Amino acid sequence: IGLLGGMSWESTLGYYRAINEGVKEKLGGLHSAKIAMYSVDFAPIEKLQHAGDWEGTAKVLSEAARRIQAAGADFLLICTNTMHKVAPEIEAAVQIPLLHIADATAEVLAHEGIQSVGLLGTAFTMEQDFYKGRLADRHGLQVLVPQEEDRQRVHKVIYQELCLGTIESESKKEYLRIIDVLAAQGAEAVILGCTEIGMLVQQIDTPVRLLDTTAIHAQKAVAHAIGEAHAG
C-alpha cells in the first residue's frame, strides 16, 4: 500500500492506524500492513493551495508519488481529499493505480442506497468540481454544500485548528449545526470530506449518517491489498 501523506500529518496518522487495524482484523495474529509512505512538508503545500498554484502542488506530489512507486508500492492513496484536485496529474506521473477517495466514498453511498448527500471539507473541496463533480457525474449523486458563510467557517476550523491538532468544543457545535442544516435541506448523509474532520465530529455526536472519508479510504485500501495478495 502506497501512502502519500503529511497533509496534515495529523490525519495521515489516522490512515496508518486504520489500515493496520483493518489488516489485523482480516488476517489476525501479528499481521500488519505492508506500507510505503512518503510524508510531505505541509507548510509549502498549504501556501501553494491558498495562492491557487495547483500546478506547483501537482509537481511536489507527483515527485513524492514516484518515490512511493520506486519503494515498491502496488497502488497509491492520496491521504487527503483536497489534493485529489491534482489526482489526474499524480496518476499520470506513475504506473501504479490510484485509489480515488471520492470513488471509495461513492461505493459506500451506493451500497446504502443514498442519493442525496451533504459535503463538508475545505473550501476547495466544497466549491470546486474535482470532488463533488466526480460524485455527481460519475456516480449520479446529488451533492449539497453549506452556504458561503458556513463554508468559510468549516474551512477556517480545518486549517487554523484541526491541522494543528486543536479541538474546540465551540467549533464542534458549529459543525453539528451545519450538518443539521444540510440534513434539513434533504441530505440523507453527510460526507466528512476532509481527512481532519473526523477528529472533531463523530457518528456518536449526531443522528445524521456521517461518512468519514479517512475510514472509508483506509478500508478500501485494506480490501484492495488483501484481494491483490490473494489473487497474486
Language model: regions and residue ranges:
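Non-catalytic structural scaffold of enzyme domains
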Residues: 1-232
